[in-house]
């Protein structure tokens, strides 16, 4: 029974990756229509990458489920080791192109947390798509003890380092914590913003439109390290402002797609890509599938 459930949940994670790359148009991002602001990857690159990562999703679930009573730091290390193996498989499939490194990190944590949660909620093993909003929130909260050490380990001694990564510079200069911060706080953007927004949208519109609306909403609120890396703080803030205006407008699906297509052209010209937003969209879709919202 457990293996079948884990197979089903793993497919939902893969489905989330495929839905995200298929959603079109997405400004600056790879989709079915074009490669966005990327010249080294395509829609098919993302499909290859997703399929390469998929076999590891069961492993993440297994680690969380069968080691649920271990120290959270040890569980994190187990997930990290498997995550690196998955990352290597991704790079092999994409010939060295980084398509899903960030979201693989988050999926390892959230699938691991899902396994941990199932170990304490055996009744859910009989009904994979019977997860509630409370279940999703609890899974996000389980990531907090897994990553309690993460910010201190990665950012605690930056003043002693001679060479800093871009993420480390962002933290020192602006206090932006990126994916590490989101994880260490239990994915509040997903649990308290993206999922409530998506659930509400799905009550009043179709699935595709709801996902496009969620994309716009996320672009208006997310601390997107990819955008900042490519264009700086000013460009990121401008994108947020532009998307907030679009978010607050009441457009038909056709007009929304037209607006997103036009903004895609703008971001391509500026070589800007909201990859952080794309990752959070994937994670939001994963939970929506678990809850049978989509």
Swiss-Prot record:
Its EC number is 2.4.2.52. The keyword ATP-binding applies. One of its GO terms (biological process) is prosthetic group biosynthetic process. It catalyses: 3'-dephospho-CoA + ATP = 2'-(5''-triphospho-alpha-D-ribosyl)-3'-dephospho-CoA + adenine. The keyword Nucleotide-binding applies. One of its GO terms (molecular function) is triphosphoribosyl-dephospho-CoA synthase activity. It comes from the Bacteria. Pfam families: CitG. Belongs to the CitG/MdcB family. This is Probable 2-(5''-triphosphoribosyl)-3'-dephosphocoenzyme-A synthase. It comes from Streptococcus equi subsp. zooepidemicus (strain H70). The gene is citG.
């Amino acid at each position: 029974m457990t293996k079948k459930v884990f197979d089903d949940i793993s497919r939902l994670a893969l489905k989330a990756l495929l839905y995200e790359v298929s959603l079109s148009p997405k400004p600056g991002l790879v989709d079915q229509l074009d490669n966005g602001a990327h010249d080294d990857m395509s829609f098919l690159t993302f499909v290859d990458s997703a399929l390469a990562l998929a076999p590891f999703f069961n492993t993440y679930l297994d680690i969380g489920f069968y080691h649920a009573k271990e120290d959270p730091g040890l569980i994190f290390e187990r997930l990290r080791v498997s995550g690196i193996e998955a990352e290597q498989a991704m790079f092999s499939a994409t010939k060295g192109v980084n398509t899903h490194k960030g979201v693989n990190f988050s999926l390892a944590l959230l699938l691991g947390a899902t396994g941990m949660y199932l170990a304490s909620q055996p009744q859910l093993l009989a009904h994979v798509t019977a997860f509630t909003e409370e279940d999703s929130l609890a899974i996000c909260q389980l990531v907090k003890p897994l990553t309690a050490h993460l910010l201190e380990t990665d950012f605690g001694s930056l003043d002693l380092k001679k060479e800093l990564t871009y993420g480390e510079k962002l933290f020192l200069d602006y206090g932006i914590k990126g994916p590490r911060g989101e994880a260490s706080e239990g994915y509040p953007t997903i649990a308290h913003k993206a999922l409530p927004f998506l659930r509400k949208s799905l009550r009043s519109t179709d699935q595709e439109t709801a996902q496009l609306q969620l994309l716009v909403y996320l672009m208006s609120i997310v601390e997107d390290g990819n955008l900042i890396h490519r264009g700086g703080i000013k460009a990121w803030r401008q994108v947020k402002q532009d998307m907030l205006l679009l978010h607050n407008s009441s457009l038909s699906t056709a007009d929304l797609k037209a607006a997103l297509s036009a903004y895609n052209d703008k971001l391509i010209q500026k070589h800007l890509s909201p990859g952080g937003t794309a990752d959070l969209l994937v994670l939001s879709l994963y939970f929506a599938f678990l809850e049978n919202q989509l």
